[in-house]
């Protein structure tokens, strides 16, 4: 069973994020959604709690999403904690 972490700012969650999760669900059995702490980042629109709640609402019925995390640490350490061997990344532009 392949588990992956998708760590992103989610400020706000966009259709691009949804597309990445949908595409990734074809490759991974389980996906952990992680919003990263970007406190103090210029232009921040939502608090960490609000961003995590948005992710939960957007991905609520997605069959591959197994957990939601808010992280202050590195994504690599989260992968170790949740026993994920893969990280999902998006590319802009």
Residue ranges of predicted features:
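Nucleotidyltransferase catalytic core that binds NTPs
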Residues: 1-93
